[in-house]
């Protein structure tokens, strides 16, 4: 049986890294995408190849059309097909709305939302003829309810959810599933600057009484890819009950 292939944007660190590890260890060909974190990507690549797993790595700023296209072309050149696309690349720059510069707004929207359009559009050139595929967009609970001091981030993640729902309706007849995962507070670099007291408060406000781990989101992604054949257009809220 041929291996399936998963392309994961922004997969050198955090949630993307955990997804890459889990998919590679579950018999997928995996393409690790990075932009600035080359050392982290190489470290992950070396770890997985030493385990005898099928992985590649490719540098691309997916907020740029040409680089997004190059990433997809590379993946097809290596593995001939893309069965699972996970749009994970994202940035967050918390600040008051009145302090958001035009440059920051454009950077956040381009990285978090435009990249999803660019990569997905190119990948569909290969998924549509096969009438098969899973697209999983990593959004955020702030895309559902909005986050104070994260208006640009919240807008980008809400846009991902709208894209997910609309695209699922378009692609359903072609047997392509499109879903989103909306993580809560996850132990990644995005929260590394929060104080210990703030982290304890967030933990206390989460009914499951813990901060999420990247592996929690990776398990959701693998479930959707492996067992989610009758799930499409949905938002899986993996947030420990923080948002209900």
Please annotate each region the language model reported:
Residues 96-97, 104-109, 191, 198, ...:
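Substrate-binding pocket helix/loop in short-chain dehydrogenase/reductase
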Residues 117, 132, 210-238, 243:
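C-terminal substrate-recognition "lid" of short-chain dehydrogenase/reductases
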Residues 172, 177, 231-233:
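Short, small/polar-rich loop/turn modules that mediate ligand/substrate recognition or access, typified
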Residues 120, 156, 164:
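Active-site helix of classical SDR
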Residues 125, 169-173:
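Alpha-helical segment proximal to the catalytic Tyr-Lys
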Residues 12-13:
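Conserved glycine-rich cofactor-binding loop
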Residues 140:
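Residue(s) in the substrate-gating loop at a strand-loop-helix junction
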């Amino acid at each position: 049986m041929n291996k399936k292939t998963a392309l994961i944007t922004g997969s050198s660190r955090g949630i993307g890294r955990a997804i890459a590890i889990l998919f590679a260890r579950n018999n997928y060909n995996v393409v690790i995408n990075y932009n600035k974190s080359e050392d982290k990507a190489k470290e992950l690549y070396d770890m997985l190849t030493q385990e005898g797993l099928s992985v590649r790595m490719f540098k691309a700023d997916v907020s740029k059309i040409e680089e997004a296209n190059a990433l997809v072309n590379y993946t097809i050149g290596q593995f001939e097909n893309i069965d699972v696309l996970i749009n994970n690349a994202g940035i967050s720059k918390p600040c008051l709305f009145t302090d958001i510069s035009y440059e920051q707004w454009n950077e956040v929207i381009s990285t978090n939302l435009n990249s999803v359009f660019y990569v997905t559009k190119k990948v569909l050139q290969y998924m549509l003829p096969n009438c098969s595929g899973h697209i999983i967009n990593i959004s955020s609970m702030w895309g559902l309810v909005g986050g104070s001091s994260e208006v640009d981030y919240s807008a980008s993640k809400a846009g991902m959810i709208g894209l997910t729902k609309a695209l699922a309706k378009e692609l359903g007849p072609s047997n392509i599933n499109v879903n989103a995962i909306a993580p809560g507070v996850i132990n990644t670099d995005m929260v590394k600057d929060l104080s210990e007291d703030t982290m304890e408060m967030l933990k206390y406000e989460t009914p499951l009484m813990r901060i999420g781990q990247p592996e929690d989101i990776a398990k959701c992604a693998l479930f959707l890819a492996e067992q989610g054949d009758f799930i499409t257009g949905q938002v899986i809220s993996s947030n420990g009950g923080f948002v209900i």
